[in-house]
From Swiss-Prot:
PROSITE patterns: CAVEOLIN. Its main location: Golgi. It is found in: Golgi apparatus membrane; Cell membrane; Membrane, Caveola. Residues 1-86, 108-162 are cytoplasmic. One of its GO terms (molecular function) is molecular adaptor activity. It comes from Takifugu rubripes. PANTHER family: CAVEOLIN (PTHR10844), CAVEOLIN-2 (PTHR10844:SF3). It is a peripheral membrane protein. GO terms for cellular component: caveola; cytoplasmic vesicle; focal adhesion; Golgi membrane; perinuclear region of cytoplasm; sarcolemma. Pfam families: Caveolin. This is Caveolin-2. Keywords: Cell membrane, Golgi apparatus, Membrane.
Length: 162
């Protein structure tokens, strides 16, 4: 029993998989706390509707109202815009969605079952019609416009200051 001069080293060795499994519950709880609202306009088709108070009401540097009036006006504008949007969407969103669903359903049906078959039929007939149309154009319309061009090209217009 003497004095020991060696240093002891102690370490914990964990596999990376064990480490990740022990952290997962903590990370998943944090992810649920800070999840953002879903983007309801992912394609930004209503960018022109993102209007704020400063986009509608602007005071030039030479004419400013009192700060409290400006802040109160801004708050009133945003609050009224918010309330009326919520009120109108509450009253009109479901009926408008129903009507638009019917309209787009009918338009899709017409396009799929009427417009596209008729278009395909015309595209099948067009090569033969194109030959006939080119012949009619070459026989009647082209000579007419060539002669009109030659006749009208000899007209000269002079302007005078009187």
């Amino acid at each position: 029993m003497g004095l020991e001069k060696e240093k002891l080293e102690c370490s914990i060795i964990m596999d990376e998989d064990e480490f990740n499994r022990s952290i997962e519950p903590i990370l998943s709880k944090k992810a649920r706390l800070y999840s953002s609202a879903p983007d309801r306009d992912p394609h930004d088709i209503n960018a022109q509707l993102k209007v704020g108070f400063e986009d509608v009401i602007a005071e030039p540097a030479s004419a400013h109202s009192f700060d409290r009036v400006w802040i109160g006006s801004s708050a009133t504008f945003e609050l009224v815009k918010f309330i009326f949007y919520r009120l109108l969407t509450t009253l009109l969103a479901v009926p408008a969605a129903f009507i638009l669903g019917v309209v787009f359903g009918v338009l899709s049906c017409i396009h799929i079952w009427l417009v596209m078959p008729v278009t395909r039929s015309f595209l099948m007939l067009l090569p033969s019609i194109q030959v006939v149309w080119k012949s009619v154009t070459d026989m009647f319309i082209t000579p007419l416009f060539h002669s009109m061009g030659r006749s009208l090209s000899s007209i000269q217009v002079r302007t005078s200051d009187t």
